[in-house]
Amino acid sequence: MIQMQTCLDVADNSGARQVMCIKVLGGSKRRYANVGDIIKVSVKDAIPRGRVKKGEVYNAVVVRTRKGVRRADGSLIRFDNNAAVILNNQHQPIGTRIFGPVTRELRSEKFMKIISLAPEVL
């Protein structure tokens, strides 16, 4: 459950280490984002010579949450951290690698690139 001011780890090699959610996209009254939702983020910590710089604003998709994802069979998949993958304006990932597991809920037409790059899909 991600809301404004939530800090997330970055699960790709775009150069950012940590980002902060500045808006949950999808309507003015929308408060929370879950796995698979697109949010607007600001880069808070970045490595030198990365593709992104501190202070820049990007779209990102949430790939892991501590709140977890409830499946239809009743199971709950939780993670140790909140993580996102940074996207460009065409909603394609900026990085070329994904770190850590992602959930099957990302398996829509929009995020198949993230699924194919991920080392593990739960």
Curated annotation (Swiss-Prot):
Transmembrane segments: none annotated. Binds to 23S rRNA. Forms part of two intersubunit bridges in the 70S ribosome. GO terms for molecular function: large ribosomal subunit rRNA binding; structural constituent of ribosome. This is Large ribosomal subunit protein uL14. GO terms for cellular component: cytosolic large ribosomal subunit. Keywords: Ribonucleoprotein, Ribosomal protein, RNA-binding, rRNA-binding. PANTHER family: 50S/60S RIBOSOMAL PROTEIN L14/L23, LARGE RIBOSOMAL SUBUNIT PROTEIN UL14M. Belongs to the universal ribosomal protein uL14 family. Pfam families: Ribosomal_L14. NCBIfam families: rplN_bact. PROSITE patterns: RIBOSOMAL_L14. One of its GO terms (biological process) is translation. The lineage of its organism: Bacteria, Pseudomonadati, Pseudomonadota, Gammaproteobacteria, Methylococcales. The keyword Membrane does not apply. The gene is rplN. It comes from the Bacteria. The keyword DNA-binding does not apply. It comes from Methylococcus capsulatus (strain ATCC 33009 / NCIMB 11132 / Bath). Part of the 50S ribosomal subunit. Forms a cluster with proteins L3 and L19. In the 70S ribosome, L14 and L19 interact and together make contacts with the 16S rRNA in bridges B5 and B8. CDD domains: Ribosomal_uL14 (cd00337).
